[in-house]
Amino acid sequence: MKRSLLYSGLMLALLGVFAGCNKDSKSDENWKDIPSNQFTAESGKAEISVNSIPVSMGNVKLTASSATEGVLQMNNVIPCASSVAVNVNLKNTGDSKWAFSGEGNIYNMAVMSLFSTDKTPIYTVSVEGEIDGNEKISIKAATKVVAKGGMEGDWNLLREAAPDKDRVPVVTPLQITWTASGDYAVSAAMMGKMLSIFGSVQLADQLDRLSFTEDGNVTARYWESDEDSGNSGIPDMKEFDGIIKKLVGPDGKYHFVPTTHTEKEWIDLPPANLAFWYANGGNLFVLPNLSVLSEMEGAQADAFVTRAADLSGLSELLEELQKLGVDPKEILPVIKNFMANGLVMKYVVTDNSLQLFMDKELCDPIVKPLLPLLDQLDKKLEDMAKNPDITEEQKAELQKLQTLMGVFGLTKPSDLKAVWANTTEFAVAMNFVR
């Protein structure tokens, strides 16, 4: 009797174990019900944000490999990174819902999608979200710069400089270094000096700070007028001495301050995923997020950049440039380089100062293909000079330009072609401090 009871109890226990195992096995198989189809932001079934900014384009796909692991594929979701795959951990939260989270690396960023074999991560991306059986998915993604190069943080435009022995500022907010050989040495030196001063006055009025954030955003404190002043921006050489005197303060130093607005009128551009940055090999790469810029209106979106990155409009752009004398074969590499790398500048970080600059090595591939445009400018100015119907304002602007060219030792804009051909050193730089 005891043996019978013991046997019956053992059988019941075994049945309970088998039933429990069968129940767990069935529960473990629920992960196979996780939707593995592609979700698009445009459809409304994918609610996505990157750095807390909602994403309106792109598609995602979650592929589960077990009850605890899967891969989240994001296409055209992370700005400037066309395809990003992240290994995620899965957790069943009930009601046919699964939470996921994970972190991955980004090895290549580009204005447009390009194949890369680079194995050094420049960004990390972390994700968390939820997917349910009703085929809806929510994702919160956050990016973080790995390739910082000492650039991260706020950089204020240089606004104060001591004079050198010739009473010229030793450094300026916008600094142009220009050296040429032979008969063009004086012209290059004069242009470097004058344009540094005039350019610094303009820059000091329009830019106060650049910020390179940890999540990769490039932001700025800047100023722009709501009204068109009608000013062509051509420097008036008659005002040069007066400008120099106004820049010198009681302390004998040069002070570059806003001239058309107050300090309280600066505009802060918040992080909005408009442009991303990373530093590598002594170069700073700034990549515009074209998917966002193309949705912006008016002057906020740069037409050339948008059209150059739109393959359907590229041929039209090249045709227009060809009509102006630009060889499409020479300008195409410039456009392709921009598509791959965005805006590329060299940089030097020293203690609490930063210099961003483009030297002759970076400028040459851009300047040379565009030099034929100067011939068109020659003709335009010649036609203006012969036209008796131009306005008094146009006459004044033409006179300023002719005076400026005379100071630089030029008779017409196309003379710059010879100056550039004999240029031995060139750099245009912006200087910042912490």
Predicted regions and their residues:
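Short, surface-exposed beta-strand/loop "edge" segments at domain boundaries and coil↔beta transitions
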Residues: 78-85, 107-115, 145-149, 164-167, ...
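Acidic/polar, low-complexity intrinsically disordered N-terminal segments immediately downstream
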Residues: 4, 22-193, 197-200, 207, ...
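C-terminal motif of bacterial Sec signal peptides marking the signal peptidase cleavage site
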Residues: 16-20
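Hydrophilic extracytoplasmic domains
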Residues: 247, 252-275, 279-434
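Residue-level recognition of conserved beta-strand positions in structured domain cores
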Residues: 102-104, 141, 222, 288, ...
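Bacterial N-terminal signal peptides that target proteins for export
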Residues: 1-9
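N-terminal glycine/threonine-rich, aromatic-flanked beta-hairpin/loop signature
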Residues: 55-87, 169-303
